[in-house]
Amino acid sequence: MFELMDKAPADPIMGITELYNKDTSPTKINLSMGVFKDEQGNTPLLDCVKEAEAKIYATEDTKAYSAIEGFSSFNDAVLPLIFGADHEAVTSGRSATIHTPGGSGALRIVGDFLTKLSPSNTIWVSDPTWVNHINIFETAGLQVKRYPYFDKMTNGLAFGTMMSALKDIPAGDTVLFHGCCHNPTGVDPSNDQWQQISDLIHGNGLMPVLDFAYQGFAEGIREDGEGPLKLVQPGKEALICGSFSKNFALYNERTGSLTAVAADAAAVNIATSQIKSVIRAIYSSPPAHGGIIVSTILNNPELRTQWESELKQMRERIQNMRQLLAETLTAKGVPGDHSFITRQRGMFSFSGLNPTQVEQLKNDHSIYIVGNGRINVAAITPDNCDALCEAIANVS
C-alpha cells in the first residue's frame, strides 16, 4: 500500500531547516525556524528552568498519568498568568485552562472541538498567517478562509480593510487572531483597535480564538495581554491557545494550554467536558514534564522573578537586533525606509523579500528564510547581521 502513495511535500518551515542542516557552508545562517537564539547563536536553557528541574528531580516520585486536562497545579497557575489574577474572567469562575501538547496541540483541539460542536465549520485567519494554522484547521475538517491584515505599502496593519472584511463574516463563524507578535508580520493592533475588533466580533455573533504564542515577547506579560484580551468581554465566549515554547524556551517539551471562556461557570464546565472528550480521542493526557517545569516556576516566587528577568533579557535582545538590522540595511544601501522593522514586535519581521530573492539568498549566500520573506530576528546576532545585510543588498 505505501508504495502506491505520493510522497508528501516538505513542510514549508521545517523543510528549510532540513536543507540548512545539509548545507556545508561555514557561514550559513538559518533565520527560518521560530526559535530564540542568544548572541552566540545558541538556543539557551533558561537558568530558572534548570533550577526548577533540579527541584523536580529531588521531589518527583511518580510517572503516573495526569488527568485528561493535565495537572491542576499547572492549569491553576497558567489561568492568572494569561489574564492576571483579578481579571473578571478569572474571578467569576467562567474560564478554565487545560494543559496541551504545545500551542499546536491546543489549536488542533480547537479545530476538532469546532468541527464537532460549532454550528459553522468555517474559521477565518489573517492574511498572512502562520502557515501551519491552515494545515491544522483543514486537517481538523474546518473550512479556512482569510481576512486581510497586512498593508504591504506601509508595512503596517491594514486596519480599515480588515474591519470591513470582518463585518461581512456570517454570524456563527470563528475568527482567529494572533495575541501579540503577529506571525509572520510582527504587526499588532493598538489597544484601541483591539477594542473596536472586540466590539465588532461580539456584536456580530462571531467566535474569537486567540493564538497567544508569544506572551511576554512584545512589551511584557501584562502589557502583551492588555489589547488582545479585550476580546474577552463579560458574558461572552472565547478560546485562547497558549504556548510556553518561546517564553520559557521549552521548545522540545511541547508545553501549551487551551483556555475556554464561557458566559458563566456552568457553561465553561460544559465546554471543558467536551474539550476533554476531544482530547481523549487524540492523546488521552498531556506530556507532563514541561507542564511541571512551568508550574514549578510560576508557583515559586523566586523562580517566577528569575523567569521574568530572563524573559525580559530575551525580549530586549530581540529589540536590539531589530534596531541593528534596520541600521545595517540602511548602511549597506538596501533601498527603502527600514524603520518599520523597529516598529514590528516579537520574533519575526516581514522583510518584503520576494520568493526569487529568498532563493538567491539560499543558493548564493547560504542564508535560509521562509519563502514569504519572514525573517526570525531572534536568530540574528551581532556576528551575522553584517553578512546578512550584505547578502540582502546583493539580491535587492
Q: What does each model-found stretch correspond to?
A:
Residues 1-70, 77-80, 281, 287, ...:
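N-terminal "arm"/small-domain region of PLP-dependent enzymes with the aminotransferase-like
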Residues 308-364:
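Conserved PLP-binding catalytic core of the aspartate aminotransferase-like
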Residues 93-94, 341-346, 370-373:
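Short Gly/Ser/Thr- and Asp/Glu-enriched loop/turn motifs at secondary-structure junctions
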Residues 31, 144, 208, 238, ...:
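Hydrophobic beta-strand scaffold residues
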Residues 272-290, 297-326:
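Structural signature of PLP-dependent enzymes
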